[in-house]
């Protein structure tokens, strides 16, 4: 059995039927797929089409109980997902290092900053310092937003100053870049990367 750091058991997501084509105007809150699944499909599209190489980092696991029924075989009986020390995804696009986190919230009024940890913020700052492109993809309020790391840093530091522990809906809509949902790729975040970082030498269509 594999458990999360809070002790809850891990239950893999089961398929619930045939996938349907989703139009670009669909509300994200009405879709069956998770943000992670959509991003994984998007990254596969980028890879197959030679656009970018982006992968999800494996979640570290701590094994606490192993059974050895045979000398040549081992069965993991109990393990826990460890807290990730960095971000969810990384890779390369047009010679630039890409590093980002993906988060979801069901709140209808704000995005809680408790979804992040200090060590993740520090990691993103280090990436930007070295010239990497760092951002957050947030699923909130029925839409998906691309939030540059620099804006996240502002909200994080503000939390320390005045105690506001969330990004309001209006703030996210203003600071973030709304991404229209598509079919292939599903969440075309590279288009935003291109606009923000390669606008003078655009190649991506």
UniProtKB/Swiss-Prot annotation:
Keywords: Cytoplasm, DNA damage, DNA recombination, DNA repair, Endonuclease, Hydrolase, Magnesium, Metal-binding, Nuclease. It is an enzyme of class 3 (hydrolase). Its main location: cytoplasm. InterPro entries: Resolv_RecU, Restrct_endonuc-II-like, tRNA_endonuc-like_dom_sf. Mg(2+) binds at residues 86, 88, 101, 120. Pfam families: RecU (PF03838). Binds 1 Mg(2+) ion per subunit. One of its GO terms (biological process) is DNA recombination. HAMAP family: RecU. This is Holliday junction resolvase RecU. It comes from Bacillus pumilus (strain SAFR-032). The lineage of its organism: Bacteria, Bacillati, Bacillota, Bacilli, Bacillales. The gene is recU.
């Amino acid at each position: 059995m594999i458990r999360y750091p809070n002790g809850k058991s891990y239950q893999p997501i089961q398929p619930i039927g045939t996938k349907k084509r989703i139009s670009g105007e669909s509300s994200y809150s009405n879709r069956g797929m998770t943000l992670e699944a959509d991003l994984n499909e998007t990254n596969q599209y980028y890879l197959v089409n030679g656009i970018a190489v982006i992968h999800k980092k494996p979640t570290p696991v701590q094994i606490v109980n192993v059974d050895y029924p045979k000398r040549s075989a081992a069965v993991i009986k109990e393990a826990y997902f460890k807290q990730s020390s960095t971000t969810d995804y990384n890779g390369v696009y047009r010679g630039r290092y890409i590093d980002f986190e993906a988060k979801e919230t069901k709140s209808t009024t704000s995005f809680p900053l408790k979804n992040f940890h200090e060590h993740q913020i520090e990691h993103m700052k280090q990436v930007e310092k070295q010239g990497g492109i760092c951002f957050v993809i947030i699923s909130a309020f029925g839409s998906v937003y691309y939030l540059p790391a620099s804006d996240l840093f502002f909200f994080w530091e503000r939390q320390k100053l005045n105690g506001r522990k969330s990004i309001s809906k209006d703030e996210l809509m203003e600071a973030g870049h709304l991404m229209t949902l598509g079919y292939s790729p599903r969440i075309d975040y590279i288009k935003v990367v291109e606009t923000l970082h390669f606008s003078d030498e655009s190649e991506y269509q």
